[in-house]
Amino acid sequence: MEADRGRNNKVRCAVVDTNVLMYVYLNKADVVGQLREFGFSRFLITASVKRELEKLEMSLRGKEKVAARFALKLLEHFEVVETESEGDPSLIEAAEKYGCILITNDKELKRKAKQRGIPVGYLKEDKRVFVELLD
């Protein structure tokens, strides 16, 4: 189901994956703005994902390098949280710990999050955020 302007009061924060942050620049999608419209007010990123973006900024070229740089600038709107795990597991850990939705376009990560009872969201091809809230 598409998010209906934040009618589910249980989830007010979002943990966002690297692939979504890169997508924002490459596809001109206003993910943070859409999530705010849906009632989300807290945006988290794990320190592990921030480090991943910093590495990508140094190693990529062209549009992807600019996208990584843009994503790092976008993090001004995010709270960076520490986790015990690294990479994708850090996103699941943070979503569980803080009671957040996980926003990712990674199919495997979405599957793992759903198995653990974490609501997920992702970007559709038309640049809209699609949110699957749990009952």
Swiss-Prot record:
Alphabetic keyword roster: Hydrolase, Magnesium, Metal-binding, Nuclease, Toxin-antitoxin system
List of residues binding Mg(2+): 17, 88
MF term (GO), any: RNA nuclease activity
Cofactor(s) needed by this chain: Mg(2+)
EC supergroup of this enzyme: hydrolase
EC number annotated for this UniProt entry: 3.1.-.-
Cited CDD domains: PIN_VapC_AF0591-like
Domain spans labelled PINc: 15-118
Keyword Cell cycle on entry: no
Pfam families per the UniProt record, alphabetical: PIN_9
InterPro entries: PIN-like_dom_sf, PIN_9, PIN_dom, VapC_family
Domain of life (superkingdom): Archaea
Family: Belongs to the PINc/VapC protein family.
HAMAP family: VapC_Nob1
Subunit structure: Dimer.
Function field: Toxic component of a type II toxin-antitoxin (TA) system. An RNase.
Protein name listed in UniProt: Ribonuclease VapC9
Annotated organism of origin: Archaeoglobus fulgidus (strain ATCC 49558 / DSM 4304 / JCM 9628 / NBRC 100126 / VC-16)
